[in-house]
Amino acid sequence: MAFVTTAEVCDANQEMIRSGQLRALQPVFQIYGRRQIFSGPVVTVKVFEDNGLIRHFLEEKGNGRVLVVDGGGSLRCAILGGNPVVQAQNNGWAGIIVNGCIRDVDEINGCDIGVRALASHPIKASKKGLGEQRVSLNIAGTRICDGEWLYADTDGILVSQIELSV
């Protein structure tokens, strides 16, 4: 998609919004990383205070995808840190959405990748690898399914059942 704001996407796709094919996440996320505008096909992960499964995905080639992580909204520890974000950047991921906390904010802000998270927290998560992958999530009042498309900029985050060409 050429540079078109999420607001313009919403304006041009009112019927998709009414039908639920295009959905906006509630505005609860902080913006991190150098890439403030990003989009791509969604890969979903559901974890709780454990980042082993997240790290596993970010070790793979991203091919412009967006990893969407439902961390249960936990504010007790960070499930994403600087090292995996650097790896994600190097492996070609477009962005990472975290329904939870991150840490190593200065390092992440230096990376050419888009990251959204609820907050930062200095305590790290466990690395047991527990969680679910490629499942439907409900984050910030919005259903997000593996394989859908995500569009993010400084106005907000949209999820679409199909790739949009605006």
Curated annotation (Swiss-Prot):
Divalent metal cation. It comes from the Eukaryota. Substrate binds at residues 81-84, 103. Its EC number is 4.1.3.17, 4.1.1.112. Coiled coil: none annotated. Gene3D superfamilies: Ribonuclease E inhibitor RraA/RraA-like (3.50.30.40). Pfam families: RraA-like. Keywords: Acetylation, Lyase, Metal-binding. Its cofactor is a divalent metal cation. Disulfide bonds: none annotated. The keyword Lyase applies. GO terms for cellular component: cytosol. InterPro entries: RraA, RraA/RraA-like, RraA/RraA-like_sf. SUPFAM superfamilies: RraA-like (SSF89562). Homotrimer. Catalyzes the aldol cleavage of 4-hydroxy-4-methyl-2-oxoglutarate (HMG) into 2 molecules of pyruvate. Also contains a secondary oxaloacetate (OAA) decarboxylase activity due to the common pyruvate enolate transition state formed following C-C bond cleavage in the retro-aldol and decarboxylation reactions. NCBIfam families: NOT-MenG, PRK09372.1. This is Putative 4-hydroxy-4-methyl-2-oxoglutarate aldolase 1. It comes from Arabidopsis thaliana (Mouse-ear cress). The lineage of its organism: Eukaryota, Viridiplantae, Streptophyta, Embryophyta, Tracheophyta.
